[in-house]
C-alpha cells in the first residue's frame, strides 16, 4: 500500500477494542485535546538526560550503528514505542508499524511469538508494508492526519516508520513535515533507519543503537535483550551513552549489571519465522 485507509483503520481499532464505532469517537472533541504527554524509558541515567521527559508529541530517530545492527535497532525502536504508548492519550490503541516491503525479506519481519517474549501483545501492532521509502513517509503522514483537530491520537497510540538505506526522499524537509504532523496529532513517531546518515533531521532525539551481550538467565540460556544506545542528539537536554537492558515483564529499560555471569547472544524479536536459521541475525 502507499497510504493509510483511515476508515479501515477505524474498523480495525474498533475490532481490537471491542467498542461500538459510533460511541468510540462520538465524544472526542470533549476529551484530552491540547494535552502534551511526556514519557520515560525507565533507566535513570538515560531519563536524567531529559529533564522534562521525552516528548510524546514529537519525532524521535533510531538508527542502526551498522547494517548488521538493524535487528537491534528494530528491537530498541519497538521498546521505545511501547514506552511512549503508555503515556499516549489513548494508551490502549494500537501502534502502527510502517515498513518497506523489502525490509521484511532482507532483515526479517516482526514475529508474533517473539513479540510475546518481548512483552508486546502482537494484536497491538498494525503492520503496514509499503513498496518504497516515499510510500512509508506518506503512510506515516496519513496516519498522523487521520481526522481533524488531533483525532489521530484517539485512533492510535504511536507510529513507527521504518526505512532502509539512505533514500533521497528522507531529507530535512521531510523530517520537518513529520515533526509538525506529530505535534498536531499529539502522537510520537519513531523513525527507524537501517543506516547512519549525515543528512540533517528535525528529530528531537537521535539514537544510535547496536546489540550488546546479555546476562545468561541460567544454564547458559539467553537473557533479556540488551542494547548499546548512544544518544547523539537531544534538543531538550544532554547526550550520553548507556548499556540498556529491556525488561519484558515491566516493559521498561534498566541497567545491565553483569554480576560476573556468562554473557550470551540472543535472537532479536523481529526475526522472521519464514527465514532459514542461517540467515537470521542475532544481537
Walk through the language-model features, giving the residues of each.
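Conserved inter-motif catalytic segment of the P-loop NTP-binding fold
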Residues: 91-158, 162
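Generic beta-sheet signal
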Residues: 98, 190-192, 210
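Glycine-rich, charge-decorated loop segments at or immediately adjacent to ligand/cofactor-binding or catalytic sites
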Residues: 105-112, 194-211
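C-terminal regions of RecA-like/P-loop NTPase motor modules
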Residues: 1, 236-283
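A conserved mid-domain beta-alpha-beta active-site/ligand-binding segment of alpha/beta enzyme cores
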Residues: 219-237
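Detector for small/aliphatic-rich hydrophobic stretches
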Residues: 1-97, 101, 114, 118-123, ...
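A contiguous pocket-lining binding segment that forms or flanks enzyme active sites
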Residues: 148-150, 155-200
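Acidic, Ser/Thr-rich peripheral helices and adjacent loops at domain boundaries
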Residues: 116, 203-224
Amino acid at each position: 500500500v502507499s497510504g493509510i485507509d483511515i476508515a479501515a483503520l477505524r474498523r480495525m481499532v474498533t475490532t481490537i477494542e471491542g467498542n461500538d464505532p459510533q460511541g468510540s469517537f462520538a465524544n472526542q472533541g470533549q476529551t484530552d485535546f491540547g494535552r502534551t504527554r511526556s514519557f520515560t524509558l525507565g533507566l535513570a541515567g538515560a531519563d536524567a538526560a531529559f529533564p522534562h521527559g521525552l516528548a510524546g508529541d514529537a519525532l524521535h530517530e533510531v538508527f542502526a550503528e551498522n547494517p548488521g545492527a538493524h535487528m537491534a535497532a528494530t528491537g530498541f525502536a519497538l521498546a521505545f514505542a511501547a514506552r511512549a504508548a503508555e503515556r499516549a492519550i489513548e494508551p490502549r490503541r494500537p501502534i502502527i508499524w510502517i515498513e518497506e516491503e523489502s525490509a521484511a525479506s532482507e532483515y526479517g519481519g516482526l514475529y508474533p511469538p517473539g513479540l510475546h517474549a518481548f512483552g508486546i501483545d502482537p494484536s497491538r501492532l498494525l503492520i503496514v508494508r509499503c513498496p518504497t521509502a516515499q510510500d512509508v513517509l506518506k503512510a506515516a503522514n496519513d496516519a498522523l492526519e487521520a481526522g481533524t483537530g488531533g483525532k489521530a491520537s484517539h485512533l492510535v497510540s504511536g507510529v513507527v516508520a521504518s526505512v532502509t538505506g539512505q533514500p533521497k526522499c528522507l531529507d530535512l524537509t521531510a523530517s520537518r513535515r513529520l515533526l509538525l504532523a506529530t505535534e498536531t496529532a499529539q502522537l510520537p513517531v519513531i523513525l527507524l533507519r537501517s543506516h547512519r546518515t549525515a543528512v540533517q533531521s528535525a528529530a528531537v532525539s537521535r539514537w544510535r543503537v547496536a546489540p550488546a551481550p546479555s546476562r545468561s538467565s541460567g544454564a547458559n540460556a539467553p537473557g533479556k535483550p540488551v542494547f548499546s544506545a548512544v544518544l547523539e542528539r537531544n534538543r531538550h537536554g544532554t547526550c550520553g551513552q548507556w548499556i540498556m537492558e529491556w525488561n519484558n515483564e515491566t516493559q521498561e529499560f534498566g541497567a545491565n549489571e553483569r554480576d560476573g555471569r556468562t554473557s550470551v547472544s540472543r535472537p532479536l524479536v523481529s526475526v522472521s519465522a519464514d527465514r532459514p536459521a542461517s540467515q537470521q541475525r542475532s544481537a
